Structure formats: structure tokens, C-alpha cells
């Protein structure tokens, strides 16, 4: 049984996790879930606010303080905003505005070379206008598992999103599933999409459950 603590509101964000129990205290959890919602404050990743960005300083402060309570033997999971928060708290920045990712349905994501044990393609629901940008981090601080099957956005806007960074997005791909494992921080499983909008037995969630269980096992070893 996986013990899950959901930060703030929205226990439905954990609906895709198999064989779980929602717990009321973070210290009892195997997994700490950071949910979706509004954008995060760009100050969290050292950038100026783009005109399209809207955030709740109160929520940001609460979730950052909660993140600081997570132990090394616990795993963080974030969906959409939650993944972006994890990205920022591990030292990376965000693209503050993109197109064609608020699709109201699913789109395909593709496995990144080197992760052959994972299926080549998965489908994820997508409802976001911002995007993780982990590519400036040291390679040992993260694993890029999936990117958009095709680069969907027509533009990438935001402070510090230079032509060089745009070129990396077009070359490597638009990040969809990233595991952050910076030394000194808890492991953070970030999913840009919304697996909670799929049934728990959907093929995508079968894969995500395997990933999550592997991370939990590794932290308990």
C-alpha cells in the first residue's frame, strides 16, 4: 500500500496511483503530491514575470514550505503546475508561454533515447500554457523520460528564453516527463500532463505506476 499525502487541495490528482491510501500527515507519506492549477511565481526560478503569467503568492509560499518538509526517503510527484514547481525548486527555469498544449484532449509523447524499458509512445491529457525547461541543469540532476511526439508549440516566450534555449527545445523536444534527482533534494517525478484525467488502468497510468514504484523502492533501499 502506497501512502500518499496531497499538498493543499485536490486528492483527485492522486487518482491514477494504484493500491494507495491518502494520509493526513506528510510525515506518514511515501509520496507527496503537488497538484495543478495557476502558474508559479517566476521569482522562484529567478525570472521576470511574462504578461501571460498569473500566480498566487500565498499558494507558492505554502507549497515551497511544504516541499522543504519532504524527507530524502520520500518521493515527490507533480502534475502540470506541480511538475513546474518541482522543476523550479531543482534549479531550472520555465518557459512562461507556449501554444498548442492546452488541447482539451490527449496528445502523444515519445520516449527519449536511452530509456528502452519504457514504451515508445504514450498518450497524456494536456492543459498547460507553461513548460518545464530542465536543459540547463547538470545532466546528473535529472532524467528526461518523455517529450512531446512532435514539437507542438509555435513559440516559446519568457524571460531568459533565448534563441539558444529555443533551439534546444526544437532539437531535444518539449519536456513532458522528467525525474529530478539533484543531490540534497528529494526525488521529484514531474509529469507535465494530467494522468488523473485518465482511468487508473489506462496504459499510460500503468507505465507511470511502474515508474513511481521504482522510485519509491530506490528511496527505501
Question: What residue ranges belong to the model's regions?
Answer:
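Glycine-centered loop/turn positions within well-structured domains
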Residues: 84, 92, 130
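Active-site metal-binding loops of divalent metal-dependent hydrolases
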Residues: 37-38, 83, 195
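Short, charged N-terminal beta->alpha structural module
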Residues: 1-21
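Flexible gly/pro-rich beta->alpha loop and the following alpha-helix that scaffold active-site loops
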Residues: 18-77, 90-91, 95
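Glycine-rich nucleophile elbow surrounding the catalytic serine of serine-hydrolase chemistry
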Residues: 79-88
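Short loop/helix-cap segments at secondary-structure boundaries that form the rim of catalytic
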Residues: 14-17, 26, 86-87, 135-137
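Active-site neighborhood of phospho(di)ester-bond hydrolases with catalytic His/Asp-centered motifs
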Residues: 78-79, 193
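Amide-donor transfer/coupling interface in amidating biosynthetic enzymes
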Residues: 6-9, 27, 34, 56-72, ...
Amino acid at each position: 500500500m502506497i501512502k500518499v499525502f496531497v499538498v493543499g487541495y485536490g486528492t483527485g490528482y492522486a487518482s491514477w496511483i494504484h493500491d494507495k491510501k491518502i494520509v493526513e500527515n506528510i510525515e506518514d507519506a511515501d509520496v507527496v503530491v503537488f497538484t495543478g492549477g495557476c502558474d508559479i511565481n517566476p521569482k522562484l526560478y529567478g525570472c521576470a514575470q511574462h504578461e501571460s503569467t498569473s500566480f498566487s503568492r500565498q499558494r507558492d509560499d505554502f507549497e515551497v514550505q511544504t516541499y522543504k518538509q519532504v524527507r530524502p526517503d520520500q518521493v515527490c510527484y507533480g502534475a502540470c503546475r506541480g511538475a513546474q514547481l518541482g522543476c523550479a525548486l531543482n534549479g531550472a527555469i520555465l518557459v512562461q508561454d507556449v501554444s498548442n498544449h492546452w488541447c482539451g484532449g490527449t496528445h502523444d509523447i515519445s520516449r527519449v533515447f536511452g530509456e528502452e524499458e519504457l514504451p515508445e509512445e504514450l498518450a497524456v491529457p494536456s492543459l498547460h500554457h507553461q513548460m518545464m525547461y530542465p536543459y540547463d541543469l547538470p545532466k546528473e540532476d535529472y532524467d528526461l523520460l518523455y517529450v512531446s511526439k512532435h514539437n507542438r508549440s509555435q513559440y516559446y516566450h519568457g524571460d531568459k528564453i533565448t534563441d539558444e534555449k529555443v533551439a534546444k527545445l526544437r532539437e531535444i523536444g518539449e519536456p513532458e516527463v522528467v525525474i529530478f534527482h539533484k543531490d540534497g533534494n528529494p526525488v521529484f517525478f514531474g509529469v507535465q500532463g494530467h494522468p488523473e484525467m485518465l482511468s487508473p488502468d489506462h496504459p499510460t497510468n500503468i507505465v507511470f505506476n511502474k515508474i513511481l514504484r521504482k522510485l519509491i523502492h530506490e528511496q527505501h533501499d
